[in-house]
């Protein structure tokens, strides 16, 4: 794309752009002292300014030097690309941050495919650049004029969003960041790829398992058809991506889906979110093992160090309160405001759904399975010793509240409903059944159509 030094009109111009490419500040200063107009010139063919060359090559000192001299941060080259676009393409995060600090416009479109800097960061897989641009989009006039959600889902002239590009190029890190920031997982392309493709179709085409995992975990529909009537499973088969096809097969078990529409899930603190995401990954990994079992495709075996980690986890569980739903794992998540605690897998099972309902805009919020109270927040549970008599367990807290909530058969969620939501959490299902039989045999099955 001509991001280096192309034809120059004079020898001084060539030396000037060459010095910018190499980051030679002394040479630049000397050339500018002899001819200050060099700062305003561009290369002959590609129309690259000194900012374009500095940004594409990661020369932050050169970039800062000319921005301080008043160089326009939104200068465009022959393809209407800005220095910010080139920095995002090449993954030069320092230059991206510097240009954003200089109020570079993130809502400019090039003339090649009408793509923004967000498209370019997603296409080339630069997660740090993507995050920086998204952070800027929440505080710049773009958020007021366009709206953040619209910017995240901006389309190029082929109808491709940044999520489409990240999925097609096999960029799972970018897929995750975009989904967390509101990218529409079910959006259809125009003429990009095959018309009417979703991000899942494009991930199936690229054969990237990690992208497929993340899209499925955020509710991507395996039955959605493109304009040719193909589902993602058919696309993966045609491309000979066997493992991807196995996971996308409509007859295989549904994956657990991150319950993003729930308000308290969107407001999770990082520590609690990490625990629940790990539980989601483990649940879907168990599902994958069952699907791929007996085929020539298999997941990597755990490393030798994983056994010792499991031993440590078992030791930790023995010293802390066990989850009163599964009786298998330590309580790591606390429900607020009631204070009841559960392990992360059981909390996830309470909130998750197996198949999203696109017609349900406002999903019912699950209640605490112990006291039937509403859930305002989920936080990391404080470590509580199982042998500490001064600190009541979740079961004890429930019994104390039994006078206030004597009719446990009412509510939108229950222990009895947890096993069906857990999917592959077989151990949790057994423990959950015991609780259902003893305490809440008549509870209604929860509805989590999100």
UniProtKB/Swiss-Prot annotation:
ANK repeats: 11-40, 46-75, 79-108, 113-142, 158-187, 195-225
Enzyme Commission code: 2.3.2.27
Pathway recorded for this protein: Protein modification; protein ubiquitination
Catalytic activity: S-ubiquitinyl-[E2 ubiquitin-conjugating enzyme]-L-cysteine + [acceptor protein]-L-lysine = [E2 ubiquitin-conjugating enzyme]-L-cysteine + N(6)-ubiquitinyl-[acceptor protein]-L-lysine
A molecular function GO annotation: ubiquitin-protein transferase activity
InterPro entries linked to this entry: Ankyrin_rpt, Ankyrin_rpt-contain_sf, RING_XB3-like, Znf_RING, Znf_RING/FYVE/PHD
Effect of residue 323 to A: Loss of autoubiquitination
Zn finger intervals (RING-type): 323-372
Cleaved signal peptide residues: none
Keywords tagged on the record: ANK repeat, Metal-binding, Plant defense, Repeat, Transferase, Ubl conjugation pathway, Zinc, Zinc-finger
Biological process annotations from GO: defense response to bacterium; protein autoubiquitination
Disordered: annotated span: 291-312, 385-450
Superkingdom of this protein's organism: Eukaryota
Complex formation: Interacts (via ankyrin repeats) with XA21.
Functional summary from the UniProt entry: E3 ubiquitin-protein ligase required for full accumulation of the LRR receptor kinase XA21 and XA21-mediated disease resistance. Binding to XA21 may stabilize the receptor kinase and maintain its protein level. Autoubiquitinated in vitro.
Protein name: E3 ubiquitin-protein ligase XB3
